[in-house]
Amino acid sequence: MSRLQLITLDLDNTLWDVEKTIRAAERDLIAWLKTHAEPAHQIYVSNDLATLREQTLQQQPNLRHDLSQLRIEILSGVMRKAQYQEHEARNLAEAAFEVFFAGRNRVAFFPGALEMLQALSERYPVYALTNGNADTSRTGISPYLKGAISSALVGASKPDPSMFHAALNQAGVSAQHCVHIGDHLHDDIRGADAVGMHSIWVNLQQSALSDGDPRPTQEVTQLSDIDAAVTAIENSLTA
């Protein structure tokens, strides 16, 4: 049996540029609102999204980790402010969200991402472990995955240990036999380290580590190097 028994993998900014993806999805959403709900469009574009988000979370703090439902509630609130009745407001919000969500899952993979997923999935069970709301089927990565853990499912976000434990428990694997791969030093690397996982820092920007930063087990600056980094960790383990 392989000494390494599980790979957990961050998605946003590890496999694709999430900021670029969200900007494109927002443009699609705004165009849809302008055509299908002009009064709501005026309210949406004249307000800061972060402000709308915080206003919604003040009323429904339980949505903090469920980004899809949070956005639906934000859009529902905008529709109500535009004087749509509750039923129509909800229907329009859900239709608007679907436009946004289609764009949110229209990702442009970083070079080597799919090849890396293919290589890892042939050797190990791979679980997505994400604070975001990307749909693994709609992004096209589900064939490479044995499971997917999201913050909405757990009710917490990385680096909360419950996120990592959810993957370990679902896979039936202990932390010392797992590698977590991600781009975020705090959410991914520190979080993995706290529960005893090995880690690979995806440092595509080639950033320098500061004194207070966590130290990953391995570091890569391109996704094509991940397979070798995983092998190095595997070889370092005792049976």
Where are these regions (language model features)?
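N-terminal helical cap/lid subdomain that shapes the substrate entry/recognition surface
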Residues: 2-111
